[in-house]
Amino acid sequence: MAGAFEVQIRSVPADRAAKHAVALSEVVLQHHRADGIQIQAQPLTGGHLLHLAVAGCVFNDLYVLAEERGIRLTEVRVVATGGFEGEEPTVSTGVSYEVSVSGEASEEELRELVGEVDRAASIPDVLRQETAVSLSGVQVQATR
């Protein structure tokens, strides 16, 4: 996973939101490894996004390693849970995740696959070791 990454989240005008918005639980997205994915997180807060990063990383890595091993996965589900406590700054209570996986392999091979992903998945590994987060720029456009 080495390399630079950029993601973006942005607001859209009310008319576009009214015309195109659907509940997140109803959205099925294309995926570069699975036939499609569905994200379940309501509401979509920063805490949900943190846990989604863990679940998404594990999900992706399951497909990557399965492909390397010649295993066809037929169903994958990763559920990440956790929370926050305290006043500002809040502190994470930790993130745990569960994996359900079905595929064209033995039970032992699938368990080994999950174990290897748990040891190698980048996002859980980064969180286990902590990482620096900094604000690198601000752009404002005043309207009054």
Model-based region annotation:
Residues 1-52, 62-144:
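Extended beta-strand/beta-hairpin segments
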Residues 57-58:
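Alpha-helical metal-binding/catalytic segments enriched in His/Glu/Asp
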